[in-house]
Amino acid sequence: MVTISIIGGTGYTGSELLRILLNHPQVEIKHITSRKMDGVNITKVHPNLKNIKNIDNLVFENISPSNLDSDFVFCATPHGASMKIVPELYETGSKIIDLSGDYRFEDLSLYEKWYNLTHTGELPAVYGLPELHRNEIKKAQLVANPGCFPTGSILALAPLVKEGIIENRIIVDSKTGVSGAGVNPSETTHYPSVNENILPYKMTTHRHSPEIEKELEKLNISNNIKLSFTPHLAPLTRGILSTTHSYLKNTDIDRDIIIDIYNEFYKNEPFVRIFEEGAPTLTGVRGSNFCDIGGFEIDRHGRIVVVSAIDNLVKGASGQAIHNLNLMAGFNETESLLYGGLKP
């Protein structure tokens, strides 16, 4: 049994952390922090959690990070806020899972360039994608939870990059639900703007681009990945469907070989499902911690199309964070996470 606290429990990722952790048999929820909601009952903000275990007795607290006194702390805070909190937590000896982008880059200058923020300083962090960094995560004190777009994109492309069978120029086209924009509404996420519409945004400048590039490059040092990434906001609440395009170096490689490569690469991964026929769907993963991968179509020019589907709030955020918790704590890594998508 471990004690956990959540810093920033009022947003969507905080809500999902609570929803999943309330069914985790090895976890005791100790503190859930919020400055604005100090003293307010958790179920006032998250009524979907009412009557689940002891949640009705918990309130949000405005409490200093150094006073959380927990084995694990989830930082569900905005980019730029975590780096002001994490150093203090790190000194207490708590293990930390940060859901912001603040510790995802080994090169802080890259973070500062793409996030337009000055970083407070480097700490030893492990990139929290279990399928690629499981052993490092188990030993880490600080884990940087991956971004939602990078999660689906990296998992879709990793076997091809690792094998060294594709050219270094890659295109990723992603469609995402509006929950990825966070709990605070904007003109872009306003219902009349997004309903029956698809909105491309940050078409060449999205800050997840270098995160995808750098992680893929670690898989094969001979690769200097040149990624073109364009996200689109779709009239969905949850989910990211990423269609990846790359070119095979050897056009003699056929679809069966590609599928064998993916099955071998992910054969021991509990949350990656390979679809040998057709493409994955968002309804198949909604509400779950799965990443479904399929497509594997090759055109006459040697272009290979691989598609991934994830729930941006679960596998793309809170579910993956809890997967990391399980690894760091030595629990069964699927604990509280092994359930199917909400289809239909």
Swiss-Prot record:
User: So what family is this one in?
Assistant: Belongs to the NAGSA dehydrogenase family. Type 1 subfamily.
Q: Molecular function terms in GO for this entry?
A: N-acetyl-gamma-glutamyl-phosphate reductase activity; NAD binding; NADP+ binding
> Where's it found, cell-wise?
Cytoplasm
Q: What is this protein called?
A: N-acetyl-gamma-glutamyl-phosphate reductase
Instruction: Return the InterPro entries for the record.
Output: AGPR_AS, AGPR_type-1, NAD(P)-bd_dom_sf, NAGSA_dehydrogenase, Semialdehyde_DH_NAD-bd
What organism, scientifically named, is this protein from? Methanococcus aeolicus (strain ATCC BAA-1280 / DSM 17508 / OCM 812 / Nankai-3)
- Catalytic activity field: N-acetyl-L-glutamate 5-semialdehyde + phosphate + NADP(+) = N-acetyl-L-glutamyl 5-phosphate + NADPH + H(+)
Entry's SUPFAM superfamilies? Glyceraldehyde-3-phosphate dehydrogenase-like, C-terminal domain, NAD(P)-binding Rossmann-fold domains
Q: Mind telling me which CDD domains this protein's record contains? A: AGPR_1_C, AGPR_1_N
Pfam families found in the cross-reference section: Semialdhyde_dh, Semialdhyde_dhC_1
Tell me one GO biological process term. L-arginine biosynthetic process
Show the Gene3D superfamilies listed in the entry.
Dihydrodipicolinate Reductase, domain 2, NAD(P)-binding Rossmann-like Domain
Briefly, what is this protein's role? Catalyzes the NADPH-dependent reduction of N-acetyl-5-glutamyl phosphate to yield N-acetyl-L-glutamate 5-semialdehyde.
The pathway entry for this protein reads as: Amino-acid biosynthesis; L-arginine biosynthesis; N(2)-acetyl-L-ornithine from L-glutamate: step 3/4
* Gene (UniProt): argC
